[in-house]
Amino acid sequence: MKRIALGVQYDGSAFCGWQSQPHRNTVQDELERALREFARTPVQTVVAGRTDTGVHGLGQVVHFDTELDRADVSWVRGTNSFLPKTISVQWAKPMPDEFHARFSAFERTYYYVLYVHPVRSPMLATRAGWVHTSLDVDAMQKAAAHLLGEHDFSAFRSSQCQAKTPVKHLYQIDVKQQGDFVHFRFRANAFLHHMVRNLMGCLVYIGGGRRPVEWMAEVLASRDRDFAAPTFMPDGLYLAQVGYPEQFAVPAPQTGSVPWNTVWTEQAQT
């Protein structure tokens, strides 16, 4: 039995999230259907992060076990030939038995793309969030600093969250403006259900002047979901990358086709 890892990208706007659900259109169902067609045998995948309805994947990682012997490029091209245009396998790689797409990961990174303009753009529908009033980027970055470190993030956790503990370690939040867009980057060991969208709701409240910077610390300390801002829209949220130990040599996400990806790649080079 061989263990194969895949890097998967998808436009999540047409799907009811990642996880398979009866009578619902999900990314997992489409991927496993395509793998079954290509492999001519049922394939069950394990995913790094279960994204919600409308959330996109740039650097999603899955693994599955199979007795089939196929070249890496065959897994990519063969599976893609049975996938819709909104999902694509980017790479395939044999892995040792100890590799696990979810439990071997030590961090996840999400991007949020926010369009700030008086009028919404239909060209960005489902690809970016939108607010019609200007935002104070400096205030949002200062507010984000209150969240860094290991905390109980119950105030940013949905009622449907199944995580065993609300304690997570948030390593990094970056906020950067580029023209009519504000870009956010969140990096943590793991995230709770709706956590990034709930963080976004609070950051936008602060950026829009509806709450002071210090309010973020009060929300965190409250551990009360009702004390925080409403859950923000999913449209601009992307699972950007999943971090693994170097021993697994997991390929980096192929994000060159995403124009705004230069926001963070250029920053890394400076």
Curated annotation (Swiss-Prot):
Substrate binds at Y110. The active site is at D52. It is an enzyme of class 5 (isomerase). Pfam families: PseudoU_synth_1. One of its GO terms (molecular function) is tRNA pseudouridine(38-40) synthase activity. Keywords: Isomerase, tRNA processing. Its EC number is 5.4.99.12. GO terms for biological process: tRNA pseudouridine synthesis. CDD domains: PseudoU_synth_EcTruA (cd02570). Gene3D superfamilies: Pseudouridine synthase I, catalytic domain, C-terminal subdomain, Pseudouridine synthase I, catalytic domain, N-terminal subdomain. The keyword Isomerase applies. It catalyses: uridine(38/39/40) in tRNA = pseudouridine(38/39/40) in tRNA. Belongs to the tRNA pseudouridine synthase TruA family. Formation of pseudouridine at positions 38, 39 and 40 in the anticodon stem and loop of transfer RNAs. HAMAP family: TruA. This is tRNA pseudouridine synthase A. It comes from Paraburkholderia phytofirmans (strain DSM 17436 / LMG 22146 / PsJN) (Burkholderia phytofirmans). The gene is truA.
